[in-house]
Amino acid sequence: MPQQIELRNIALQAAQPLVHGVSLTLQRGRVLALVGGSGSGKSLTCAATLGILPAGVRQTAGEILADGKPVSPYALRGIKIATIMQNPRSAFNPLHTMHTHARETCLALGKPADDATLTAAIEAVGLENAARVLKLYPFEMSGGMLQRMMIAMAVLCESPFIIADEPTTDLDVVAQARILDLLESIMQKQAPGMLLVTHDMGVVARLADDVAVMSQGKIVEQGDVETLFNAPKHTVTRSLVSAHLALYGMELAS
């Protein structure tokens, strides 16, 4: 399994250019946070990595490398990169139980799909009574439960990398904290490389090792999390950090 995945000069276009020459490097055991405002190109960059661009959007330049060798996004999805989606309610088939979802995920990747394996993954993400959870349909579960189930399926993939696209969006404060605890636990136990897409600098401060800031389809600043919080350079980065510090009655040094 690869130890590093590199996005090199990725460019995306629809009716007009959307992402301009984005380069990112994911490393096993480290969390790279991709931050920026809505419409900055964060989720599109993730979609390009996985080969799931929306209709009408195409990649016009760039490549993806695994340990320095060019690789197709389709060869990465699921096997080498697991995904935690932004909206879990739309990610599950409403006609299938959690057992069907989890089992099909395992079978598609050639992983064990026995009930003991599925139960262990569900228990690992803190969902109680795994036997009952496996019988549930998506509409019978809360947003927080569905997000945990999605993380359980990422655990089942045993992929060396994870893309987590706004994993705490639309969750209440308690559910958000639990999801962050889970992601932190996964990093400690499995040490995958993680691309964490978020607009929440509190999430960045807690989980990230490195940060890349996007604005208008470009990476405008990139560095380790400590440097970025203590000495942000770009106006977009300074605005994000200042807004975060203001929540605690603090100000960014001029």
UniProtKB/Swiss-Prot annotation:
Alphabetical list of Gene3D superfamilies matching this protein: P-loop containing nucleotide triphosphate hydrolases
Domain of life: Bacteria
SMART domains: AAA
The keyword DNA repair is annotated on this UniProt entry: no
Bilayer topology term: Peripheral membrane protein
Ranges in coiled-coil conformation: none
Name of the top EC class for this enzyme: translocase
Residues of the ABC transporter domain: 2-241
UniProt-annotated binding residues for ATP: G36, G37, S38, G39, S40, G41, K42, S43
CDD domains: ABC_NikE_OppD_transporters
Record-level GO cellular component terms: plasma membrane
A Pfam family matched in the record: ABC_tran
Locations listed in the record: Cell inner membrane
Family of the protein in this entry: Belongs to the ABC transporter superfamily. Nickel importer (TC 3.A.1.5.3) family.
Designated name of the protein: Nickel import ATP-binding protein NikD
